[in-house]
């Protein structure tokens, strides 16, 4: 682990919190599509 994992997790959380995922194709959440939520 070179430290990027923490940044990725933070980015994912931030994206999900903003509800900014566009059907699991958002570049910041593509690694965890199961948690990706589309914008309403």
Swiss-Prot record:
Keyword Transport annotated: no
Origin species: Conus betulinus
Q: Which keywords annotate this record?
A: Disulfide bond, Ion channel impairing toxin, Neurotoxin, Secreted, Toxin
Q: What is known of its domains?
A: The cysteine framework is XIV (C-C-C-C).
Question: What does the protein in this record do?
Answer: Probable neurotoxin with unknown target. Possibly targets ion channels.
Disulfide bonds listed in the record: 21-36, 24-29
User: What does the organism's lineage look like at the top?
Assistant: Eukaryota, Metazoa, Spiralia, Lophotrochozoa, Mollusca
What does the sequence similarity comment in the record state about its family? Belongs to the conotoxin A superfamily.
Answer yes or no on keyword Secreted: yes
Q: Which InterPro entries match?
A: Conotoxin_a-typ
List localization entries: Secreted
State the name under which the record lists this protein: Conotoxin Bt14.16
Q: Which GO terms describe its molecular function?
A: acetylcholine receptor inhibitor activity; ion channel regulator activity; toxin activity
Provide the tissue specificity: Expressed by the venom duct.
GO-annotated cellular components: extracellular region
Superkingdom, according to UniProt?
A: Eukaryota
**Which residues are removed as the propeptide when the protein matures?**
1-18
